[in-house]
């Protein structure tokens, strides 16, 4: 289950890069604005990581993971409502906040469930989900975006995340 959630964690964050040309055309975004969209998620994610770890130490890890999954998935879907740069920037930053709780909680769970003999293997397997999500997210967001519009990419990814969390 952690592996699949992590796939969506990375697919959702990667999706925007594959639809940059569509966003640029529809919203007349500048290269600087595209760069800011690309980094908004990372700034919030990076700045909130320590706080997220402290929160995860005080709540049930499963709650942090599933709560984060629902929050970031709903925000991902809401991204489709964007009509300008400010909306996109807000949703990207908010999604970064939602996703920041996943890794502290998942690494803690993996450490607890796997002893010295299997811990590295478990974390290595989990790490593969990062690349599957990044590659798959980029590919499918671009594919969906080209054929059905960029908004549907975010609706599909976010919707699948919500279903996964149920």
For each predicted feature, which ranges?
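Extracytoplasmic
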Residues: 1-31
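Small-residue-rich segments within alpha-helical transmembrane domains of MFS-like 12-TM solute carriers
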Residues: 10, 14, 80, 96-104, ...
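Helix-breaking motifs and short loop linkers at transmembrane-helix boundaries and internal kinks
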Residues: 28, 60, 81-87, 98, ...
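Conserved MFS/SLC helix-loop-helix module at the cytosolic interface between two early adjacent transmembrane helices
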Residues: 47-85
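Cytoplasmic helix-loop-helix junction between adjacent transmembrane helices
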Residues: 91-132
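Helix-loop-helix hairpin linking two adjacent transmembrane segments in secondary transporters
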Residues: 126, 130-166
């Amino acid at each position: 289950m952690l592996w699949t959630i992590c796939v969506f964690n990375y697919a959702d964050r990667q999706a925007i890069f594959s639809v940059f040309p569509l966003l640029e055309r529809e919203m007349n975004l500048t290269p600087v604005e595209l760069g800011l969209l690309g980094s908004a998620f990372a700034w919030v994610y990076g700045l909130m990581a320590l706080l997220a770890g402290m929160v995860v130490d005080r709540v049930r890890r499963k709650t942090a993971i599933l709560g984060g999954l629902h929050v970031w998935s709903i925000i991902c879907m809401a991204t489709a409502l964007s009509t300008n740069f400010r909306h996109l920037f807000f949703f990207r930053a908010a999604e970064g906040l939602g996703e920041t709780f996943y890794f502290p909680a998942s690494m803690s769970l993996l450490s607890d469930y796997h002893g010295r003999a299997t811990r590295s293997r478990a974390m290595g397997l989990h790490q593969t989900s990062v690349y599957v999500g990044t590659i798959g997210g980029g590919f499918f967001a671009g594919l969906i975006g080209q054929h059905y519009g960029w908004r549907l990419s975010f609706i599909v990814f976010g919707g699948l995340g919500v279903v996964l969390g149920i």
